[in-house]
């Protein structure tokens, strides 16, 4: 975990990994380049979530919601209660920020924390000294720059990560960020996967021969490849992780067609949701399930589940993929 004075280091970070933006236009719109932009539905969902959590917080502070009921509500909004103060974890999808987002996070660090924040190893940002009652207000400020803390904690699908130089590194097969964004949109508020046996982490890599996203240390790793016919698709890994039981993931499918990304992920997580342990949180990650079943048996279960899904509504339409890709233009210096 990298600890920085976010206010003082803002200039240094600009030069390293930020997208620079023109100013806000007269109608209040932010002109963005090279990253996904919320549409009206995206923004409305986040605004409604902030208002909902503000109401839940008010009722909790008034004693109308007991502690055990408030626990999953705060976790769903990225809040851990630690020894001295709450910790609020902010999602930074596939590690990409623009300058306005970083400035808002710096203001939050200055006004609601102690001038510091932690960038985590999985491309999130954490505040360690906010007041619990001020967290909805913080989330409201983040919503103004299209950020949130949804699914940054709890037993759900977490932030999808990729290479920190995605989109600019010469060795990548294609830009992996559109695929990360597709996974983000699919997994956020997914009703079936809100209460998994344990947290679930996905990483995407697009450099063949170099695991630049540490995909084999994730619950699911997606390696973008081309088959012998030149078709774009994925090699899929499952069952990796660190912690007290570090395991490198295994290949569960050598080639998955590009349009089948979400249906196959759906199948993997359904198998995990059904067979993963819930009696011991230290043995509840998918890596333990894959090891217990064996990768061959686990793959058979996934393939059987996928048979029911692969020709359904979850197949990724080419026009939707192109729409997402259109947000990720090359920077001027390439």
State each model region's role.
Residues 13-21:
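Short hydrophobic targeting helices and cationic amphipathic motifs
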Residues 27-334:
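Peripheral terminal and linker regions in Fe-S/redox and tRNA-modifying enzymes
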Residues 3-4:
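Short, low-complexity, intrinsically disordered N-terminal modules
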């Amino acid at each position: 975990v990298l600890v920085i004075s976010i206010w003082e280091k803002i200039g240094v970070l600009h030069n390293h990994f930020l997208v620079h933006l023109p100013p806000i236009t007269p109608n209040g719109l932010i002109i963005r380049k090279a990253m996904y932009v919320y549409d009206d539905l995206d923004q409305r969902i986040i605004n409604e979530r902030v208002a909902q959590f503000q109401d839940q917080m008010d009722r909790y502070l008034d004693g109308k919601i007991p502690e055990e009921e408030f626990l999953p509500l705060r976790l769903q909004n990225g809040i851990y209660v630690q020894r001295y103060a709450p910790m609020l974890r902010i999602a930074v999808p596939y590690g990409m920020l623009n300058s306005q987002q970083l400035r808002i996070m710096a203001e939050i660090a200055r006004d609601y924390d102690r001038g510091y924040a932690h960038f985590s190893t999985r491309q999130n940002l954490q505040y360690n000294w906010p007041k619990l009652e001020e967290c909805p207000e913080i989330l409201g400020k983040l919503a103004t720059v299209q950020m949130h803390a949804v699914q940054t904690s709890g037993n759900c699908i977490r932030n999808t990560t990729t290479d920190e130089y995605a989109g600019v590194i010469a060795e990548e097969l294609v830009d992996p960020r559109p695929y990360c964004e597709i996974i983000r949109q699919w997994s956020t508020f997914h009703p079936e996967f809100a209460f998994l046996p344990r947290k679930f982490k996905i990483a995407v890599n697009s450099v063949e021969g170099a695991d630049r996203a540490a995909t084999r240390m994730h619950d699911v790793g997606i390696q973008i490849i081309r088959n012998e016919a030149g078709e774009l698709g994925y090699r899929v890994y499952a069952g990796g992780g660190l912690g007290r039981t570090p395991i490198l993931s295994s290949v569960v499918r050598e080639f998955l067609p590009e349009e089948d990304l979400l249906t196959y992920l759906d199948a993997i997580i359904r198998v995990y949701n059904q067979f993963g342990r819930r009696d011991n949180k230290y043995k509840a990650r998918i890596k333990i399930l894959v090891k217990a079943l064996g990768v061959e048996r686990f793959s058979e279960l996934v393939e059987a589940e996928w048979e029911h899904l692969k020709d359904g509504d979850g197949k990724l339409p080419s026009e939707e993929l192109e729409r997402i890709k259109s947000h990720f233009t090359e920077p001027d210096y390439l």
